[in-house]
């Protein structure tokens, strides 16, 4: 287990640790239970090594793995909140940290399951629950999230939002988080190495375009099929990378994060204050800026009419290439 980054809690802001968790090879419920124990052990050991730690982040699929033959079975799914999240909550309370965790969630309405992330605070309370808005189709079978993009208070003056893996490839997701007040966007991922460059690029662009910190971490290691790249990354609100991990399983990537600086940039910048300028175009020529929406895709998406010009020619529109049956009905 190695580490990259800072070791101390700043006077203002907070210290975070991103855990490059080794990709779990999970075949049974007993394997999931073992991963939960390992995650809890990691919370306690990381807090012991970094006493000033306030936020610890685990990647997507760290709890239940990526066994695609079983990942939607009743045996593998969890209820949120439920016994598993209760164990995470107890660990966060004991170690006095905020924790970000990945759960493949049983659908309470009996439909397809969700890919879910939660934040638990140092009092052991679940303060945020997010369901992945953009499953990585056609590989993933998860139902598209229905909880929007919530924001919660975090350590050191932070306003936290979480997105999951493929979500971060959509600039609209990061913009939604910022628009709702987030100054720190956490991205938990289970990508294999094919998209590592794009993952790092979008972590930086999401930070820069929205004047917010991004804290991102991926699974690491080999599961017998794919290699997962780790590479925990903390980006400053100006889009520069503050800390970058390597490809080592169990590497701990730490950083001091100063949300107040992002807040100050949003209030004080003129040039490149793009999160504000989007809704106040040309305010020098037009006092207050032009407010009308000029974007066709925004209008069409809002009206449920989004369609790209080449849509009728797109070849892959269902999950059959990965063995999923074509659904007879479209679930809203």
Swiss-Prot record:
It comes from the Bacteria. One of its GO terms (molecular function) is formamidase activity. InterPro entries: Aliph_Amidase/BUP, C-N_Hydrolase, C-N_Hydrolase_sf, Formamidase. Pfam families: CN_hydrolase. SUPFAM superfamilies: Carbon-nitrogen hydrolase (SSF56317). Keywords: Hydrolase. It catalyses: formamide + H2O = formate + NH4(+). It is an enzyme of class 3 (hydrolase). Transmembrane segments: none annotated. PANTHER family: FORMAMIDASE, NITRILASE C965.09-RELATED. This is Formamidase. It comes from Bacillus thuringiensis (strain Al Hakam).
């Amino acid at each position: 287990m190695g580490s990259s980054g800072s070791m101390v809690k700043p006077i203002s802001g907070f210290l975070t640790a991103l855990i490059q968790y080794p990709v779990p090879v999970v075949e049974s419920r007993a394997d999931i239970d073992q991963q939960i124990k390992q995650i809890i052990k990691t919370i306690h050991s990381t807090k012991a090594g970094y006493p000033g730690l306030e936020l610890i982040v685990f990647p997507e699929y760290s709890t239940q793995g990526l066994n695609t033959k079983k990942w939607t079975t009743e045996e593998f799914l969890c209820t949120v909140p439920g016994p598993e999240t209760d164990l995470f909550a107890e660990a966060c309370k004991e170690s006095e940290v905020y924790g970000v965790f990945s759960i493949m969630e049983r659908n309470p309405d009996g439909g397809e399951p969700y890919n879910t992330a939660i934040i638990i605070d140092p009092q052991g309370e679940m303060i945020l629950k997010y369901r992945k808005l953009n499953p990585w189709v056609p590989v993933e079978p998860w139902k598209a999230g229905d909880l929007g993009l919530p924001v919660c208070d975090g350590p050191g003056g932070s306003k936290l939002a979480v997105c999951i893996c493929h979500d971060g490839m959509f600039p609209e997701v990061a913009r939604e988080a910022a628009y709702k007040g987030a100054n720190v966007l956490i991205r938990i991922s289970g990508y294999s190495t094919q998209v590592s460059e794009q993952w790092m690029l979008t972590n930086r662009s999401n930070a820069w375009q929205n004047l917010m910190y991004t804290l991102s971490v991926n699974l690491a290691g080999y599961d017998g099929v794919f290699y997962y790249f780790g590479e925990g990354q903390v980006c400053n609100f100006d889009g520069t990378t503050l800390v970058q991990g390597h490809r080592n399983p169990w590497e701990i990537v730490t950083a001091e994060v100063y949300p107040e600086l992002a807040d100050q940039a949003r209030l004080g910048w003129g040039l490149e204050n793009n999160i504000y300028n989007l809704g106040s175009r040309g305010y020098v020529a037009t006092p207050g800026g032009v407010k009308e929406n000029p974007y066709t895709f925004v209008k069409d998406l809002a009206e449920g009419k989004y369609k790209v010009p080449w849509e009728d020619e797109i070849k892959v529109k269902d999950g059959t290439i990965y063995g999923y049956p074509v659904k007879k009905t479209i679930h809203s």
